[in-house]
Amino acid sequence: MAGGCALKVLVAPLDWGLGHATRCVPVVREFLNQGAEVELAVVRSNAALLRNIFPELRQRLAPSYNIVYPKHGYNMGLWLVKNGAHLRTVMNYEHSFAEEVVDRYHYDVLVSDNRFGFYSRNAKSIYMTHQRRIAFPRVLSAFEPVGMLWHASVMKRFDEVWVPDVPDLPGYAGTLSHVKKCPVPIKYVGALSRFEGEKLTEKSDVRYRFVAVVSGVEPARARFEELLRKTLVKIPGRHAVILGKPSLGVKSSNEQNLDLFTHLPDEQFAAVVKNAEWVVSRGGYSTVMDMAVLGARCVFVPTPGQYEQIILGRDLAHEGYAVTIDESKLSTETLLAAISEKARVALPKPEDDNNLLKDAVYATIHSRISSH
């Protein structure tokens, strides 16, 4: 930031699915609203989505983690151990990339959404994560302290940690985000959704019984899509399946009682979801926050091997906020039985005005201004 120019911010979401990119949207908007100049560090899998939302913002191609999820449940913890060398290589590469772009383009602030190596000694570096506790299934619980120590070592490289949740338990992420100790200053910045604060005026012409939202990384995404199609086609009524393929543009087709969409812009997505009786989706944390903002009644189907999603689904079901079904048990019969038993579930709606995020951005901007 030189010669009175606006604070220059680079926002970098992790490329493990699109959820990290979508929850960065309100962060980008808030920095822009408060006068900062914002650019985006993207990979090929999230570039199209972010370009659709922010066509005016410059994008820089960042290193990709190239993650492929394990096919079977409860393997993610062991997968991380097995692929530790790959992660370290990417972290070192992205750290070099971060230092290079800060030196070349003079960024004042880096915002890393779960990118473990995206920090710089020459810029304020903010690490955003809801998963302060890295949870493992019971059979691998001995690894949990090791996972937390490793994550703490990652966070120590940053100047600040932002947690997309409310400060008080249970919040939306429960014990995953509410951990007593943190090695660096921590700020809760509220639930973050790309639909937050937006005036969503578009209305859907169709009242769907189920809207299925497909997301995640291959091959888990394709497997989930196939399962949802087989499940919903047997249920009377009209259903929509949003395939989670923004790189293909906005295309639609019909198969029997299913309306298929490759991708939907935010206004259309919100209209379809808000006009649905039920939404069936993965239980990723960004999806949970989006559905809370849109007031959806949800059936969450955790991605096999992602114990974080299993814990989130279990905790949300315990609080009466949502229904959860294991992918291995999802069928026409189990889906209909689950919603008949939990007809009154509802996610708590976040506050319309997220002052936690506003305050965090304001403090960041003014701390950098005062240091120059």
Where are the model-predicted features located?
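Conserved nucleotide-sugar phosphate-binding/catalytic loop shared by glycosyltransferases and other
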Residues: 6, 15, 33-85, 259-260
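A donor-sugar binding/catalytic signature common to diverse glycosyltransferases
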Residues: 268-311
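A short, glycine/small-residue-rich beta-strand->loop->alpha-helix junction that serves as a flexible
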Residues: 13-25, 219-222
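C-terminal amphipathic helix plus adjacent low-complexity
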Residues: 337-372
